[in-house]
């Protein structure tokens, strides 16, 4: 399972896309380069060399640093300073069992897809497989609002191993078939870059439709591709629903939260960084004025190159400033059994009004 770090890759991809790969990036494994696959450590921004872990200035562009210098940085905090975000065992167990039921069934359905059906969806769009919530394990908390953390748990041997195997296999199936699931977005920027637009509509002219329950609070974006805009001048419309941490799954920090690999089960984040093991590491926040100034430069340059609307769609409300506030300035909080009292009584674990699907949203003609 991935270690919980601020998503440097996401920001590097964003900047590289905006500047067409002309931004110099540094990694310990590969040194300075314009295209890097390893964990990024430094990048050039606004005449300065910036640490990708804390967005602090570590030198000037002319200096061309050969390694990431030591500075007050989240990446260089001692191991004993890490904070464990620990989830109560029963909560983790419920999540895992519900998720296993879901991914195992979706995996089985994908296995039964014929090449003819796959070709049809690729050319005509639409849904390839659908899983109705009623098919999920009836003992799962995701089935009904009446389920609770204290409901009996089904015993599953090697639960972690099975969940990891099914989850990995399902991801490989989706990737190899070049399909789009409506229950996760591996990279939020794919809402633009991974979906083809009709006509000559510019990506920055994306039309959007919002669910009436949405708010400006940041949360998980669930994209439903079933509603499409056919006007070529407007591009494609999405119905978006926001799942907010305070309202839907308790008040705890989101700097450990990975939007990029998060499937949603009935408005609950079923799997995210560290979730399969029940805990993840979070770095304490260290604030610095140089870092804040650098962020402003970064925001201005990327907004200018990519457009505010596209940035906002890729990184959520608040754009890059909001992303920075959420990932870099989030105080570590431990979720304990006592903290479960913050879970709302009205949380609905399986009350989605549409099934989860895997398919291609593109419709020709």
Swiss-Prot record:
Chief place of localization: virion
A Pfam family of this chain: Reovirus_cap
PTM section of the record: Cleaved during virus the endosomal proteolytic disassembly of the outer capsid.
Role, per record: Stimulates translation by blocking the activation of the dsRNA-dependent protein kinase EIF2AK2/PKR, thereby inhibiting the host interferon response. Sigma3 prevents the activation of EIF2AK2 by competing with the kinase for dsRNA-binding.
UniProt protein name: Outer capsid protein sigma-3
Subunit record text: Heterohexamer of three sigma-3 and three Mu-1 proteins. The RNA-binding form is probably a homodimer.
Entry's family note: Belongs to the orthoreovirus sigma-3 protein family.
Cellular component, GO, one term: viral outer capsid
UniProt GO BP: regulation of translation; symbiont-mediated suppression of host innate immune response; symbiont-mediated suppression of host PKR/eIFalpha signaling; symbiont-mediated suppression of host type I interferon-mediated signaling pathway; viral life cycle
SUPFAM superfamilies per record: Outer capsid protein sigma 3
Localization of this protein: Virion
Keywords: Capsid protein, Host-virus interaction, Inhibition of host innate immune response by virus, Inhibition of host interferon signaling pathway by virus, Inhibition of host PKR by virus, Interferon antiviral system evasion, Metal-binding, Outer capsid protein, RNA-binding, Transcription, Transcription regulation, Translation regulation, Viral immunoevasion, Virion, Zinc, Zinc-finger
Ranges annotated as CCHC-type zinc finger: 51-73
GO molecular function: protein serine/threonine kinase inhibitor activity; RNA binding; structural molecule activity; zinc ion binding
InterPro entries linked to this entry: Reo_capsid_sigma3 (IPR000153), Reovirus_capsid_sigma-3_dom_sf (IPR023634)
Organism: Reovirus type 1 (strain Lang) (T1L)
């Amino acid at each position: 399972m991935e270690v919980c770090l601020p998503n440097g890759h996401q920001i590097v991809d964003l900047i590289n896309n905006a500047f067409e790969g002309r931004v110099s990036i540094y990694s310990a494994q590969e040194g300075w380069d314009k295209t890097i696959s390893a964990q990024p450590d430094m990048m050039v921004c606004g005449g300065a060399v910036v640490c990708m872990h804390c967005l602090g200035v570590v030198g000037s562009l002319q200096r061309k640093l050969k390694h990431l210098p030591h500075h007050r940085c989240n990446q260089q905090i001692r191991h004993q300073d890490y904070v464990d975000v620990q989830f109560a065992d029963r909560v983790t167990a419920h999540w895992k069992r519900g998720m296993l039921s879901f991914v195992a069934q979706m995996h089985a359905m994908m296995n039964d897809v014929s090449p003819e059906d796959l070709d049809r969806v690729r050319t005509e769009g639409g849904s390839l497989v659908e899983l109705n919530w009623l098919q999920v394990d009836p003992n799962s908390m995701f089935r009904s609002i009446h389920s609770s953390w204290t409901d009996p748990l089904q015993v599953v041997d090697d639960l972690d191993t099975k969940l990891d195997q099914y989850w990995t296999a399902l991801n490989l199936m989706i990737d190899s078939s070049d399909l789009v699931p409506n229950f996760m977005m591996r990279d939020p920027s794919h809402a633009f870059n991974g979906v083809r637009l009709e006509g000559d509509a510019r990506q920055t002219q994306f039309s959007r439709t919002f669910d009436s329950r949405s708010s400006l609070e940041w949360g998980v974006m669930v994209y439903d591709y079933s509603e499409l805009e056919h006007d070529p001048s407007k591009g494609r419309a999405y119905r978006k629903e926001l799942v907010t941490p305070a309202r839907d799954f308790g008040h705890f920090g989101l700097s450990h939260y990975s939007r990029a690999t998060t499937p949603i089960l009935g408005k609950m984040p079923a799997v995210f960084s560290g979730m399969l093991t029940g805990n993840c590491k979070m770095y304490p926040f260290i604030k610095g004025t140089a870092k804040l100034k650098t962020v402003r430069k970064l925001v201005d340059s990327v907004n200018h190159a990519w457009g505010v609307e596209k940035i906002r769609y890729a990184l959520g409300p608040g754009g890059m400033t909001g992303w920075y506030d959420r990932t870099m300035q989030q105080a570590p909080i431990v979720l304990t059994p006592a903290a479960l009292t913050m879970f709302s009584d009205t949380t609905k674990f399986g009350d989605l009004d549409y099934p989860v699907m895997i398919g291609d949203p593109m419709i020709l003609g």
